[in-house]
Amino acid sequence: MGCAMSAEERAALARSKQIEKNLKEDGLQAAKDIKLLLLGAGESGKSTIVKQMKIIHESGFTAEDFKQYRPVVYSNTIQSLVAILRAMPNLGISFCNNERETDAKMVFDVIQRMEDTEPFSEELLAAMKRLWADSGVQECFGRSNEYQLNDSAKYFLDDLDRLGAKDYQPTEQDILRTRVKTTGIVEVHFSFKNLNFKLFDVGGQRSERKKWIHCFEDVTAIIFCVAMSEYDQVLHEDETTNRMQESLKLFDSICNNKWFTDTSIILFLNKKDLFEEKIKKSPLTICFPEYAGAQEYGEAAAYIQAQFEAKNKSTTKEIYCHMTCATDTNNIQFVFDAVTDVIIANNLRGCGLY
């Protein structure tokens, strides 16, 4: 006797196959929509990563962007010099030449008049160059871990002639080096490897953290940024707390959060270039008194990585770690390519498609 299906059964089977097909398509679509959350303490390089995504995966900066960053470069440069000048008496450092007092007054006056976003006058530019060349100012700069100073200070102050030119226009690297405190949430959309990325950058300072909470839903992966070079520095918001210890505490709370049980965690140990320079002269024991290794990049970097990985209490969750230099476009392009491959594999696995 035959097993012919009734019209109803055929329709039910067709519906079932269509539902299966739809579910698979939905799964594939879900695997294509990637939501990334950039986390990390203040000044760990998150905003620079966002800028790099614009360069690498969008069309880069617009003419309007270049124009808007010009006053930011002026301000970052003069504010960095002022931070050094203000730190000098606190550290008991004097100018090599007393005439620099007059130059310093000119710089302070510009800040007081809130003209730090204006192009440098010839007199101001000359004063800034004399100050930056002063051995007392250089000595104070060499102790910048003892006060708050932008990472980009040397980059800009070493290039005062270019920045002070009448026809100065910021370069891509200038924009990457600028520092503007992130408040609220910055969102960037781009496509890469047939995936649709939404990248969220949230303010890293303590006062901003409460705003992260509603970004957490449906996150595919977290990129957690740590400034490796800040092992001997304290927080802006609390000058008794070591910056790297704060990052470790924050990483612990994110990595082991019940909301992120199934979320890939990617650790960017950032500012490797600054760390490589600093580790030669500033001991890692400032942050990790128990460290007994060499004061050299490879061993010290591996130790820092191990400290972060040790915070992971899960036996199933893997931490994907990369040493990065957020201002180096080639480095970030290479790292993000590797990160994307991990996300694709994990995401397809999560959808039962891998």
UniProtKB/Swiss-Prot annotation:
**The keyword Lipid biosynthesis is assigned to this record:** no
Residue ranges, annotated region (G3 motif):
197-206
Region annotation G5 motif: residue ranges? 324-329
Q: Which GO terms describe its cellular component?
A: cytoplasm; heterotrimeric G-protein complex
One Pfam family assigned to this protein is G-alpha
Domain annotation G-alpha: ranges: 32-354
Q: Which PROSITE patterns match?
A: G_ALPHA (PS51882)
Region named G2 motif:
174-182
Task: Mention one GO biological process in which this protein takes part, according to its record.
Answer: adenylate cyclase-modulating G protein-coupled receptor signaling pathway
User: What SMART domains does this protein's entry cite?
Assistant: G_alpha
Enumerate the residue ranges of region (G1 motif). Answer: 35-48
Q: Where is the lipid attached (S-palmitoyl cysteine)?
A: 3
Record's keyword terms, sorted: GTP-binding, Lipoprotein, Magnesium, Metal-binding, Myristate, Nucleotide-binding, Palmitate, Transducer
Q: Where is this region: G4 motif?
A: 266-273
Q: Where does GTP bind?
A: 40-47, 176-182, 201-205, 270-273, 326
Molecular function GO terms recorded: G protein-coupled receptor binding; G-protein beta/gamma-subunit complex binding; GTP binding; GTPase activity; metal ion binding
- Positions where lipid (N-myristoyl glycine) attaches: 2
- Sites where the protein binds Mg(2+): 47, 182
- Cited function: Guanine nucleotide-binding proteins (G proteins) are involved as modulators or transducers in various transmembrane signaling systems. The G(o) protein function is not clear.
Which family does this protein fall into? Belongs to the G-alpha family. G(i/o/t/z) subfamily.
How would you summarize the oligomeric state and partners of this protein?
G proteins are composed of 3 units; alpha, beta and gamma. The alpha chain contains the guanine nucleotide binding site.
The name on file for this protein is Guanine nucleotide-binding protein G(o) subunit alpha
